[in-house]
């Protein structure tokens, strides 16, 4: 009886794993789904999307990103976003605030504002 119980338990676990891996991604959000970015989300997205490749390359060589070396840069970006300034993230007279806060934009659209 215990062998059949363990077999049934393993089969149930395998079935749950297969169902989750097959159907589990239906309700997850695609990373490039357009979304609204306002306030402090703008500098956070800017740092994440524009400096991710540079930071990953620096990690491979053991160097930190220049933004992390200067601790004040991150807080400066966040402070500017709180004051609703469209700082240096502008493209052809349309700032990132107008483009991604007033209507949703994808990661690919946001990366166009990387300088």
UniProtKB/Swiss-Prot annotation:
Propeptide section residues: 25-29, 53-94
Modified residues (Cysteine amide): 114
Entry-linked InterPro entries: Insulin-like, Insulin-like_sf, Insulin_CS
Organism ancestry: Eukaryota, Metazoa, Spiralia, Lophotrochozoa, Mollusca
Annotated signal peptide: 1-24
Biological process terms in GO annotation: glucose metabolic process
Recorded family membership: Belongs to the insulin family.
Protein name, entry field: Con-Ins T1A
Alphabetically ordered keywords of this record: Amidation, Carbohydrate metabolism, Cleavage on pair of basic residues, Disulfide bond, Gamma-carboxyglutamic acid, Glucose metabolism, Hormone, Hydroxylation, Secreted, Signal, Toxin
Subunit text: Heterodimer of A and B chains; disulfide-linked.
């Amino acid at each position: 009886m215990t062998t059949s119980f363990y077999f049934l338990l393993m089969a149930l676990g395998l079935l749950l794993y297969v169902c989750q891996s097959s159907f589990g991604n239906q309700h997850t959000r695609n990373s490039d789904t357009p979304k609204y970015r306002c306030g402090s989300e703008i500098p956070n997205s800017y740092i994440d999307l524009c400096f991710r490749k540079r930071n990953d390359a620096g990690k491979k060589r053991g160097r930190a990103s220049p933004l992390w070396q200067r601790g004040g840069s991150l807080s400066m970006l966040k402070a500017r976003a709180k004051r609703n300034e469209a700082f240096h993230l502008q493209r052809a007279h349309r700032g990132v605030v107008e483009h991604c806060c007033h209507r949703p934009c994808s990661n690919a659209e946001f990366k166009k504002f990387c300088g």
